[in-house]
UniProtKB/Swiss-Prot annotation:
Disulfide bonds: none annotated. It comes from Corynebacterium urealyticum (strain ATCC 43042 / DSM 7109). Part of the 50S ribosomal subunit. The keyword Repeat does not apply. NCBIfam families: L31, PRK00528.1, PRK01678.1. InterPro entries: Ribosomal_bL28/bL31-like_sf (IPR034704), Ribosomal_bL31 (IPR002150), Ribosomal_bL31_B (IPR027493), Ribosomal_bL31_sf (IPR042105). GO terms for biological process: translation. Keywords: Ribonucleoprotein, Ribosomal protein. It comes from the Bacteria. Pfam families: Ribosomal_L31. GO terms for cellular component: ribonucleoprotein complex; ribosome. This is Large ribosomal subunit protein bL31B.
Length: 89
């Protein structure tokens, strides 16, 4: 590998905002927030919406995630289209 062309790859803690579960892994992601891990070291903390702990594919539970009203916005824009098409047919 060439030197000094690859991003910094370091330990990072990812936290699932839905379940609170935390994972220590390696990533190029950075954060100003830190958390003390079980080994006593501090690592950057990245908070994410979905992980394998909360994703419907892995949990088997279906749920609708509404991030900043996106579902309602979609329903307002396109929700009536299905009803309108049925009336014209």
């Amino acid at each position: 590998m060439k030197k000094d062309i690859h991003p910094d790859y370091h330990p990072v803690v990812f936290k699932d905002s839905a379940t609170g579960k935390q994972f220590l892994t390696r990533s190029t992601a950075t954060s100003d927030r830190t958390v003390e891990w079980e080994d006593g070291n501090e690592y950057p903390l990245i908070v994410v919406d979905i992980t394998s702990e909360s994703h419907p594919f892995w949990t088997g539970a279906q749920r609708v995630m509404d991030t900043a009203g996106r579902v309602e916005k979609f329903q307002r824009r396109y929700g009536g289209m299905a009803r309108r098409k049925k009336k014209t047919q």
